[in-house]
């Protein structure tokens, strides 16, 4: 790519996490989702896709095996520095996060970007009520990416009433010993492809958003 072309290009940055997703999905589920959405967008728009940022703020999963979490402060600071380093090469960054726990960190990144004059946008998957973690949504998307990623025989339902408030107070382990918040039993690859098409369209809308005049 010629250097002079880079100044008006958009960079998609997949942001994930490394945390439990029940017994049936991999620890890298959120990173796979974010990377898949970015790659889907790259098939319909001329954008660049950065290597995935595979860790995030996942303190709510404390106590489950395999957790690697940076926390909100470190995640935000790392991504602020990423924006600063990218500004000479790309005129717009779109962070595509597969993990809802990154919301506060990315909100901080956007706030700093606005002050410093950078064009930074953020996208998160739309969640279905009662299906926030390792349920039908994420399981379907991973089935559409590669069925070998999903151990369907291990999928279990777990969505206690009022789980959102409880999770914020006590963490996921206190309300769901399996780590699942949702029902993966109805997951299908076709459903995953439908979700991906919708999510791709949402990110494309961000890519196509009119730019501020510098």
PLM features: what roles do these ranges have?
Residues 1-94, 100-214:
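Extended, histidine- and acidic-residue-enriched regions that form the cofactor-binding/catalytic faces
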């Amino acid at each position: 790519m010629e250097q002079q072309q880079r100044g008006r290009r958009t960079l998609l940055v997949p942001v994930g996490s490394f945390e439990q997703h029940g017994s049936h999905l991999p620890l890298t589920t959120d990173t796979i989702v974010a990377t898949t959405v970015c790659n889907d967008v790259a098939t319909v728009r001329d954008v660049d896709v950065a290597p995935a940022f595979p860790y995030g703020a996942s303190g709510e999963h404390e106590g489950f095996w395999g957790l690697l979490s940076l926390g909100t402060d470190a995640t935000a600071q790392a991504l602020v520095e990423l924006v600063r380093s990218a500004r000479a090469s790309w005129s717009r960054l779109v962070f595509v996060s597969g993990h809802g726990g990154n919301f506060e960190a990315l909100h901080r990144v956007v706030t700093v970007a606005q002050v410093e004059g950078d064009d930074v946008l953020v996208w998160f998957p739309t969640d279905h009520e009662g299906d926030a973690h390792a349920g039908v949504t994420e399981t379907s998307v991973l089935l559409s990416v590669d069925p070998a990623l999903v151990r369907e025989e291990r999928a279990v339902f777990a969505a206690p009433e009022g789980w959102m408030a409880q999770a914020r107070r006590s963490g996921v382990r206190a309300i769901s010993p399996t780590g699942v918040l949702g029902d993966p039993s109805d997951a299908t690859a076709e459903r995953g492809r439908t979700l991906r098409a919708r999510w791709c369209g949402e990110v494309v809308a961000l890519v196509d958003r009119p730019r501020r005049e510098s």
